[in-house]
Each structure stands twice: as C-alpha cells, then as structure tokens.
Amino acid sequence: MAEVDPKLCIALDDINEAMDCENQDNMGGIIPSVIFGYHADVATWPDYPKKTESPLSLEEAGTLVGDLVMKESCRAYKMDFTDELAEFKITDQGESGGESFLMDLNIISAKMRKKIFGFENATKGRKMFFIVTDNNGTNYLMGDKRRGALRASGDGATTGASSTARNQNTLH
C-alpha cells in the first residue's frame, strides 16, 4: 500500500445543509431510550475508518465502521426515561495536537426508583458503553474498544420541595 499523504487523509468538500437531500429532518433532542452495557461484555467494536490510497470523504471520516457485537451469553440493556428530559452533547477538548471529543449524556429519570439506585450502584467506576439515538435517527456510540464510557457524576436524587416539584434522578 502506498504511503498516504497526511494532509490528504480526509478530503474537504462543500457543506450545504440545504442540499443534504438524505437528511431533511433537523429535530433537536434524543429519543427517550438508550442502549447500554458493560465494556467487558463486548466481543467486537465498530472502529474508525481505515486510511486508504485515496482520501476519506467527510461523511466517511465521520462514520464508524462495523457493528457492536456482544460476547456469547452477554447482552445489552435498554433504559427508557421521560421524553425531552435527556440531552446528548459532543464538545471539543484538548490543546493543539491533542484534540479529541468529549461526549456527555445527561438523563433525568422522573421519579426516584430503586432500579435507578441499583443502576448507579452497578455502574460505579465500571467501564460502560451507551448507544444514543437522536430524533433524526443518527446513532452515537459512547465508549469504544480503547476506552469505556464512565458515569461521571449526577445531580443526585431529589423529591423536590413542593408537591408540584419533580421527583427525579439525574445521571451524567
């Protein structure tokens, strides 16, 4: 395979959302459900596209290749939560030469429940993966074969101060 010019790993192209015929929707938010599991239970991970003789298109450079496949006798799980009470963010981080992306999923689960407390206990310090789907049908993978996603914190559980306040758990 010929050496790839690092300046040509990804080919620039025009970006015009008005011409994005395949993706007409632009609804904000995520669907009120995520798929999750333990990092150690994954047999095969999707990965970044490989360098080729010709530069990757912008779309190829922004898409993982392959599927997430669980190990035998392991499974992924689903968490449903209150609609429009979760947010997924991708932010740039790092200094020049060390840039990367930080993904943050913030879920508010209406009503304090034993099951949510159990989830918090089961995931403390554990490497995880989460699959988040936005309202336009795009899937995002938190955690990969190199590093698992970690539950960073939460605003805790609260009953609220008044009878009209929300009884909830907040997870990050």
Predicted stretch roles:
Residues M103-H172:
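Conserved binding-pocket/active-site segment within a compact domain
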Residues K7, K50-K51, K71, K78, ...:
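Context-gated lysine
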Residues E3, A18-L102, A149-R166:
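Solvent-exposed edge beta-strands and adjacent loop segments
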Residues M1-K7, H172:
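Viral virion structural and adsorption modules
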